[in-house]
A protein has these predicted regions:
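NAD(P)+-binding Rossmann beta1-loop-alpha1 motif at the extreme N-terminus of oxidoreductases
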Residues: 2-67, 71, 122
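Amphipathic alpha-helical segments at domain termini/boundaries
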Residues: 8-11, 21, 35, 80-100, ...
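Hydrophobic/aromatic beta-strand patches that form the interior of the parallel beta-sheet core
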Residues: 45, 87, 102, 152-154, ...
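A non-catalytic, amphipathic alpha-helix used as a structural packing/dimerization or gating element
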Residues: 52-63, 177-188, 231, 235
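Rossmann-fold dinucleotide-binding core
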Residues: 128-197, 202-206
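Rossmann-like NAD(P)-binding element
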Residues: 52-53, 67-128, 136
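NAD(P)-dependent Rossmann-like dehydrogenase/reductase catalytic/cofactor-binding core
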Residues: 2-15, 180, 187-198, 217-221, ...
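Helix N-cap / loop-to-helix initiation motif
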Residues: 50, 75, 175, 224-228
């Protein structure tokens, strides 16, 4: 009898369905995650540190879908239905009935640890916790929660609505049913998942960010200008955008955080962040979001800054 009950409980967990998703962070990644979840028919609660930020996130989602309607990529009925499914949540207590809570805050380990420490007590026992981190150890983040076995990395690519890939990363304690539930969730969103082990920056950013960092070194050492480097990689390597333009799009602070995680986590000098990247971040030149990075966006059309 005890065996039958255990099997039933395990099967119940394996078929755990995600119907309601909490998203912590209403910025670029968070609002993108909220958008794709709502379009997939899921109810979404979006949380951030202020109502103004949550309202801005809602406006961004609405604007993005309105543009898709204008292009014929989305029906007005689907846009309205998705917007009706996204609500704001002022406090972590409001996320208590979510089946999955996705953290999409800034790429700062201390910030994420504080979020998970505060969040865990308010969630129902069956709820999964996921992080959208692009570089931080899943095992370390899971350790501050009350459910490391129900914790997983679900790393979306930017921009979330357009990019097909999602990385799934298990921590050392992540159970099989958590992984299978996360995999089914990603499939419901119409995206493709790939599995990475819990190493710094996982797969995509371990390959991508050193390339961007090397492009910044190429600029720093005077090998080529911003325009020359980006043109070379667009036309010579068939990249859709140059590495410096891509760095601005990602955010130079995020690029630096990932390179620091690689450098510290793997202890290899080849991952040392370029001093020019450090200087730009110190200056507050973070790319498109601050309207200045390797390009100046303040006058409209991007102008190379070096």
């Amino acid at each position: 009898m005890a065996y039958d009950q255990a099997v039933t409980e395990r099967v119940g967990r394996m078929t755990h369905e995600i119907l309601k998703v909490g998203v912590i962070g209403a910025g670029q990644m968070g609002n993108g995650i909220a958008q794709v979840c709502a379009l997939a028919g899921l109810d979404v609660l979006m949380n951030d540190i202020s109502q103004d930020r949550m309202n801005a996130g809602l406006a961004t989602v609405d604007g993005a879908m309105a543009r898709d309607v204008a292009k014929g990529l989305l029906s007005e009925a689907d846009r309205k239905g998705a917007m009706d499914r996204i609500k704001t949540a002022a406090a972590f207590e409001d996320l208590g009935d979510c089946d999955l809570v996705m953290e999409a805050a800034s790429e700062n380990e201390e910030v994420k640890r504080k979020i998970f420490t505060r969040l865990s007590p308010f969630l129902k026992p069956a709820a999964l916790i996921a992080t959208n981190t692009s570089s931080v150890s899943i095992t370390r983040l899971a350790s501050v929660t009350d459910r490391p076995e129900r914790f997983i990395g679900i790393h979306f690519m930017n921009p979330v609505p357009r990019m097909q890939l999602v990385e799934l990363i298990r921590g050392i304690a992540t159970e099989d049913d958590t992984f299978e539930t996360a995999k089914a969730f990603v499939a419901r969103l119409g995206k493709t998942s790939t599995v990475s082990e819990d190493f710094p920056a996982f797969i995509v950013n371990r390959i991508l960010l050193p390339m961007i960092n090397e492009a910044i070194y190429t600029l720093y050492e005077g090998v080529g200008s911003v325009e020359a480097i980006d043109t070379a990689m667009r036309l010579g390597a068939n990249h859709p955008m140059g590495p410096l333009q891509l760095a601005d799009f990602i955010g130079l602070d995020t690029c630096l955080s990932i390179m620091q995680a690689l450098h510290e986590g793997l202890a290899d000098s080849k991952y040392r962040p370029c001093p020019l990247l450090v200087k730009y971040v110190e200056a507050g030149w973070l790319g498109r979001k601050t309207r200045r990075g390797f390009y100046d966006y303040r006058s409209g059309a991007p102008i190379p800054t070096r």
